[in-house]
Amino acid sequence: MRHPLVMGNWKLNGSTHMVNELITGLRQELSSVTGCDVAIAPPALYLSQAKQALAGSRIALGAQDVDVNLSGAFTGETSATMLKDIGAEYIIIGHSERRTYHQESDEFIAKKFAILKQQGLIPVLCIGETEQENEAGQTESVCARQIDAVLNTLGVAAFQGAVIAYEPVWAIGTGKSATPAQAQAVHKFIRDHIAQKDAAIAQQIIIQYGGSVNADNAAELFSQPDIDGALVGGASLKANAFAVIVKAAAAAKKA
């Protein structure tokens, strides 16, 4: 049985004070929670501080992006070896904000996936359609294309131990969310798409939902059979709000 994963993406938010305060709150809120893996991805500048603050807890450290190069003349970038060295485990790639604001292509994101696997890190591959694509009935074809960029270059075995986060772009930070039934349908499509290559890998892969996940909709989302947790944005910046989502995932998957 798949173990749910709830991960907080802090995006461009944080300060030295906020990192300590939020992690202290998370440790208190989640101290007795079992049955759900938890990770947070602070901005790169605070990863070392966050790692120290997380010491001795069950909360894993993640990061929001990675470069395709391991070292060299690449000003401003962060490499997979650096993230591994500092203790990060789950690395978000392909977030729609990176795809949109930094013009990252499916092929470029597949290179990031490859470098993370080579370094023994866990890729959290974000996929999802825009509102325009959704209205045009292209949700499945867009998700398939984004997955195939990895499948066609690395093979299905690369998805062993990886994470996919389905984040409909129209639901990120908008307050809109896919209904549980809508989200489940896409998650099932994603799993079935990978199962065409390898059913066993498809069954073990964690597929998170992301896009305005909050305390009100978390329990119903997690009750769906193919939704294995969440990639949480805004709600991950408040310990109590994030904890409610983690507890909902743990409870739903134990049921």
Curated annotation (Swiss-Prot):
Involved in the gluconeogenesis. Catalyzes stereospecifically the conversion of dihydroxyacetone phosphate (DHAP) to D-glyceraldehyde-3-phosphate (G3P). This is Triosephosphate isomerase. Pathway: Carbohydrate biosynthesis; gluconeogenesis; Carbohydrate degradation; glycolysis; D-glyceraldehyde 3-phosphate from glycerone phosphate: step 1/1. One of its GO terms (biological process) is glycerol catabolic process. Substrate binds at residues 9-11, 173, 212, 233-234. It comes from Photorhabdus laumondii subsp. laumondii (strain DSM 15139 / CIP 105565 / TT01). GO terms for cellular component: cytosol. SUPFAM superfamilies: Triosephosphate isomerase (TIM) (SSF51351). The gene is tpiA. The active site is at 95 (electrophile), 167 (proton acceptor).
